[in-house]
UniProtKB/Swiss-Prot annotation:
EC number in record: 5.3.3.2
Pfam families cross-referenced by the UniProt entry: FMN_dh
Subunit structure: Homooctamer. Dimer of tetramers.
Family: Belongs to the IPP isomerase type 2 family.
Residues that, per the record, bind substrate: R11, K12, S99, M100, R101, Q162
Gene3D superfamilies in UniProt: Aldolase class I
Subcellular location field: Cytoplasm
Purpose: Involved in the biosynthesis of isoprenoids. Catalyzes the 1,3-allylic rearrangement of the homoallylic substrate isopentenyl (IPP) to its allylic isomer, dimethylallyl diphosphate (DMAPP).
Listed name of the protein: Isopentenyl-diphosphate delta-isomerase
Chain positions recorded as FMN binding sites: S68, S69, M70, T71, S99, N127, K194, T224, G274, L275, K276, A295, G296
Amino acid sequence: MLKDQNLDIERKQDHIEINLTKNVESTLKSGFESIHFIHNALPEINYDSVNTTTTFLGKSLQAPILISSMTGGTTRARDINYRLAQVAQKAGIAMGLGSMRVLLTEPDTIKTFAVRHIAPDIPLLANIGAVQLNYGVTPKECQYLVDAIKADALILHLNVLQELTQPEGNRNWEKLLPKIREVVNYLSIPVIVKEVGYGLSKKVAESLIDAGVKVLDIAGSGGTSWSQVEAYRATNSLQNRIASSFINWGIPTLDSLKMVREVSKDIPIITSGGLKSGIDGAKAIRIGANIFGLAGQFLKAADTSESLLSEEIQLIIEQLKITMLCTGSRTLKDLAKAEIRL
C-alpha cells in the first residue's frame, strides 16, 4: 500500500514537471481554426455593456470559463491550486481540482486540494478517475471527496488511453457504466463526466446522459496529449514507442462538441481541449458549449506567480468580450447566434 501511495505522489510530480517543460501537444488541431466569425463593423453596442455573465451549477460566473482540472497531492501542486483558487475567486470563474484519489489513502494531502476557504463563492469541482470504481473506490468514498473540499460537483474523468500507455495504468474498463450510475444515484450533488483530451463520441454521450450524468466535459483532441506525457514517463523504449504512437489520437474538440450537442440540446457542455484564447472560447459558445475550459497555459502561469495567472485569465476574458462586441453580441445568448463562416 505504501508503495502505491508513493507512486501516486511521484506520478503527480512527474505530470507537473513534464507538462511545464516538455512539448506534449497533440498533433491534431482542435478544429476551431476552421471557424471564422463574420466581423460586424457597426455593432451599435457600448463595450461596457457587453455581458459575459452566466450560471453554472446554480452559481453565478462573471465569465463562462473553467480552470480545468490539473493537479493536487504535492507541495508544488498545493501552491499551484492556491493561486488558481485565489485568481478564480477574484475573476468569478469556475475551478476543477486534479485527481483526488491520493486523498483516499493519504489524508494529509487534503491541504493540497482544500481551497474553499480561498474561493468561497465559485463553482468548485472534486475529481477522481472513473476507472477507480473498478478498483475498489465506492460511491461513499466519492461523497467523502466531495465533502472534503465542499465541492459543488464531482468529476469522474475518463482517461482510458492515458491509463493504457502508463506503466502502472489501470486496464479493467469492463462494466464501468453501471458503477457510474451508482455514483450518480448516491451523491448529493451533480456528477460531471470528463474526457482528458480525446473527446466524447455521440454514443458515449448518450450512455452517460442515460446514466443520469448532469454535465459533460468533452475535452477533445487538440491540446495536451496525455499519451505523450506518459511517453516521457516511460521506463523503457517499448513503453515509449507505444505511448508515442498515439500522439494524433482522438476526436478533435469541435467534432466532439457537435456530436454531443446533437445528442441533447439541454445537457450543459463544458468544452475543453486545445482552446488557446477567448476567441476559441467564443467559437465554442457559438457552436453549443455552455462554458469553456483551459488548463495548460493556466498551469504555466500559476507555477510562476499569482499576478501572471491573473493577467492570463484577464487576457482570455478581454479576448472574449472583444469578440462579442465585434460580432454584435451583447450577451452570451447573442454570441450563440452570431454569424460565422466555416
